Amino acid sequence: MKNRVGREIPDDILKDKNYKAFETTEIGHPDKQRVAPIVTVTNGDNKVVNSIKEIVEKLVKDGMTISFHHHLREGDQIFNDVMQAIIDLGIKDLTLAPSSLTNVMNDMVVKAIKSGTITNITSSGMRGSLGDAVSHGLLKNPVVFRSHGNRARAIEEGKIKIDVAFLGVPNSDEVGNANGMEGDAAFGSLGYALMDAQYARRVVLLTDNLVPYPNTPASIKQTQVDYVVKVAKVGDPDRIGSGATRFTKDPKELKIAQMVNEVITHSPYFKDGFSFQTGSGGAALAVTRYLRQAMLDNKIKASFALGGITKPTVDLLEEGLVNKIMDVQDFDKGAADSMKNNRKQQEIDASWYADPDNKAAMVDQLDVVILSALEIDTKFNVNVMTGSDGVIRGAIGGHQDAATAKLTIISAPLVRGRIATVVPDVTTIVTPGDSIDVLVTEVGIAINPKRHDLLETLSNIPGVPVYTIEELQQKAQQIVGKPKALEFTDKTVALIEYRDGSLIDVVKQVKD
Amino acid sequence: MEIKKTALAGTTESSDIQITLSKGNDGIDVDLTSDVKKQFGDQIVKVITDTLNKFQITNAKVRAVDKGALDCVIKARTITAASRALNQEDQINWEVL
């Protein structure tokens, strides 16, 4: 059947996997049953295990669901070491359910799929050789992509039942009190991993830094942890976070950032006590700089900044322009260090951050968010999952979740090389157009016609031309020409869930 | 027109295309490498072929390494490569342009 955003969702998937097709961005006030994990009781005396092989042999069995977090990003060592041990032991038919997959994990996942070790995957996203392999049909069962908030929801409601969580931490004591802030592999917030620690049947911490008991502050607590494994190295500190964040000099990105700033400061939401979330892209970082000046000029302070945090946001906190940072992950060393030292930078878990089935998530209180897009179409639907060739190379991240903000801005260049960003129909719908309010490109902005109020307030900003989104799409096409339609086979290789667990789109195998 | 020598124009910077022309005897044979081949491959080959035809080049081997160039860039690089291959770079054929 076709869902409400016009995407054909195969009937057998709806039936076999008991899915609903996407209908609305409204969550409403349903009653939701949460699940609780089985606890194997211990007094904590014998939690330390000396090798990954030993813990895998003890806990992992055919057919289980295992999880990891991605806070160590491209510096992660834990994932590859644990997966290699699992492959070596000949374990089969696992479901891999990490918070996301980074490039450093790609080759290992491909290997584990080929050996039959992994037969199902749910993740926020995937890129590189893994995305390419999955898009070419390597995995028999479709990958399920969920946003960070949706993963938290699915775990709480028992849709993802984690049997064993392998969580790399930069420090822990022998009973399992740990945080993300101290040690060689420090990465700051443990936000995504906190879900696994709370709900997995078995929680295994892996650390290269055993510290005296009791370890505080404890983000993950001894009450949640079954085993602590001492490993040689958790990760490569140089690759965990990018170093000093560099401001872009790209004139196109600066122009976009400037216009984003104009849109924000001319919107009704720019007033004392407002809140915002920016991503980590070049333009988003530049927006933070322009926004800082606008806040100083207008004597406006923000109540909180949310989401993935970077040093420029921390600078605003230290300057007193932002009162609190609500931190689910840290993108650079400056942000990670700051969490240790600044009480106003609060670690939050993925549920608190963005779970829709909640007694209010932080994103529900968010005023302004700036998000990116690989593609955006004339219905304002956004694709952050598949490239212009139809191959998986992205992640939902918090896109669908944060897009529920009162003012959701997509910042994107009109074209990238010969690829149009503004298109008649996106290849894959990740975030529905109903959530998107304004598109900002280097040539001007388009306002979602559903936002009559914004059409009025944003239409006469000097230096910010307003177009319809159809006009922007036409402009893009005039530059790059009309591309030939992509070809796909009938095989579904991935399912895109909306944050409420309904199906908003599917990804088909590419035809080569 | 006969190609006199192998000639090259363009770079492999993003949004550029590198065109190498050499002698051929079986029509215009374009060997294209491009990240956007699926969407724009036919169009790129057409621009190159049309441009060469204006030079009355009917036999050539073309190696094209595309980095997302727009049609105007593809045309410009092909014209330059063709002028060089025909030893005409000092006597630009303005009618073709």
Curated annotation (Swiss-Prot), chain B:
Determine if Cytoplasm is one of this entry's keywords.
yes
Which residues does this entry mark as bearing O-(phosphoribosyl dephospho-coenzyme A)serine? 14
Xref: Pfam families? ACP
Q: Which UniProt keywords apply?
A: Cytoplasm, Phosphoprotein
What are the transmembrane regions? none
Compartments, as annotated in UniProt = Cytoplasm
- Where is this chain primarily localised? cytoplasm
Stored InterPro entries: CitD, Mal_deCO2ase/Cit_lyase_ACP
Q: Name one GO cellular component term.
A: cytoplasm
Similarity field = Belongs to the CitD family.
- Give the record's subunit note: Oligomer with a subunit composition of (alpha,beta,gamma)6.
Q: What is this protein's function?
A: Covalent carrier of the coenzyme of citrate lyase.
Name this polypeptide is given = Citrate lyase acyl carrier protein
